[in-house]
Amino acid sequence: MSEIQNTMIVAANAIRKGSVDVRTKKLCHYTSPDGLLGIFKEGAPTLFFSQYDSLNDTKERKDIFESLKKYCDKQLKKGIMSKELYDAIVSIPQSDLFGITRKTNKKLILDNGEIVEDITAFADEECYTYICSFSKNNDSLPMWRMYSKAEHYEGFCVEFSSSAFSRKQYYRKGFSVELVKVIYDERKKMELIEGVLSPIMGLYDSATKRDKENLLSIVKIMIRDFQFVFKNKSFSYEEEIRAVLHIPKTESNNTGQVSERKYRQSNGLIVPYVIYNMEASSVRSITIAPTIKEEITVNNLKDYLCSKKLSHIHIISSDIPIRNV
């Protein structure tokens, strides 16, 4: 194995190490009373996924590029990174290419004559990206304040199972969805970037043109994988886990799991979005906001869920001792 190949493996491993496994985490979605009724309007739950550039963080998707430039500026000043590598990295553009798998009707005939049906097609395609936000905390005062859409912390927190976003939900269906845990801490961001770039910096200048392209491809993979993971530390109270949905721009989605591209008004903006359909079993519980009149709310919520054949959902009262004034 060449030194370049070994370096690429080390850098790729740093990317994998930086990825956070969120399969065992709670997926808690804060919403208003109207939002709750919207989620269960059709019985089985549905969620709105909004286009990434319409979310509350005006620097959504930009943090990875700012963090990367900050790291490269420091290494260039120290003389550790060459100007050539610096220029190559900071000029990497934002890309909407993401890997999509599709089921095809094509057949493959193997050398032994065996026929393989329904070949899976994989390609990087230009995609729209939509995000639905969750928290790992189902009873957070700042989250009640931010997302329940009322002055008196009135709202609900719906806990979903991560199985609603597992690979089997999208494989070969013409879209992709992944769960990621947001990174806010600046030190962790720099450590991840260091793990990827450190082995590359020592070899890049002396590498062939082809090897330089290969080394830069690892940096591009890091940007692709973490552009929706890095977020400004001001939002750290959200403890966000997000579902990131990629849908090709060139085709209509007709799987039934994801709606066509739609538009709605929010805070004066026209927001593109899609509706993601889930199974009833994906909902685990609903937590009631701290200042809602508990007894009548619990009874009415139970009645509502029963009418939607969702009586399996556990209802939880907030433990936050705050008075409604």
Where in the sequence are the language-model features?
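Partner-binding and oligomerization surfaces adjacent to conserved cores of proteins
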Residues: 1-325
